[in-house]
Amino acid sequence: MDKQNSQMNASHPETNLPVGYPPQYPPTAFQGPPGYSGYPGPQVSYPPPPAGHSGPGPAGFPVPNQPVYNQPVYNQPVGAAGVPWMPAPQPPLNCPPGLEYLSQIDQILIHQQIELLEVLTGFETNNKYEIKNSFGQRVYFAAEDTDCCTRNCCGPSRPFTLRIIDNMGQEVITLERPLRCSSCCCPCCLQEIEIQAPPGVPIGYVIQTWHPCLPKFTIQNEKREDVLKISGPCVVCSCCGDVDFEIKSLDEQCVVGKISKHWTGILREAFTDADNFGIQFPLDLDVKMKAVMIGACFLIDFMFFESTGSQEQKSGVW
């Protein structure tokens, strides 16, 4: 054995390589023939195989037809502000088109965009909102569709159509609010909003319930059957804190979620009506009812937080 090793070393004394082995690899790289089982992977000085290498490379290097990891799984479209869209999940059974996103989330964040023209001139423009999940991914984009005269003459009590689109630009939810009385002292013509998904197909309603002290609402399904209740605080003031509207069972004994108006800072609260909201609901809640909760949030926004400055609805007592 010693004699054989000495013969092998004599062939390439400067590299200590076996007889017949090409000496193109550096001395420190020799760990045995490439691909030979029982030898460790490549060392620091071992050069990687060239691009398109088809043979069995050293251990630790990817082989052909093997997936490359740490790459994005979804080709997500990116919005104007660089916000990624939420990947579309597998639609559950009997799910209206476009509502499959709601099947996998239990929290929604709604951010109203600041309109510079409205801030500088007080001229009321169409409201626009970003609807995101808890990871900051955009789920929907919502835009109000009303004429100039209606917005500036009727103010927060105005009727409106609010269209909610998905990442493909398809309108998946439509909110219809008729013109109603905004005073709690007049119980004959209270606020309501209709939620449609897809557009033209009602899936639920949010109906204001008269109460002398508290803002209350009833959530109804497409058959006008009561499903849930919403109860807000007596003082709908957002000064330095959030305002919570609790989502309750029909007997109002169990709280199942909430709609929160988030405090956005003294300057934004004082000079704009661009508000931030959060909606929390059970993960297993029907996607139609989750969409109805979005409609309830927009109705609450227009009723209590659309006015600016020290106007009554912004910091009043219900």
UniProtKB/Swiss-Prot annotation:
A motif (Nuclear localization signal) lies at residues 257-266. It is found in: Cell membrane; Nucleus; Cytoplasm; Cytoplasm, Perinuclear region. Magnesium. Can also use zinc with lower efficiency. It comes from the Eukaryota. It comes from Homo sapiens (Human). GO terms for cellular component: collagen-containing extracellular matrix; cytoplasm; cytosol; extracellular exosome; Golgi apparatus; membrane; membrane raft; nucleolus. Residues 306-318 are extracellular. Phosphorylation at Thr-161 by PKC/PKCD increases its phospholipid scramblase activity during both cell stimulation and apoptosis. Phosphorylated by OXSR1 in the presence of RELT. Residues 1-14 have a biased composition (Polar residues). This is Phospholipid scramblase 1. One of its GO terms (molecular function) is zinc ion binding. The modification Phosphotyrosine is found at Y69, Y74. Changing H53A: 60% reduction in nuclease activity. Changing H12A: 60% reduction in nuclease activity. Residues 1-84 are annotated as: Proline-rich domain (PRD). Residues 31-44 have a biased composition (Low complexity).
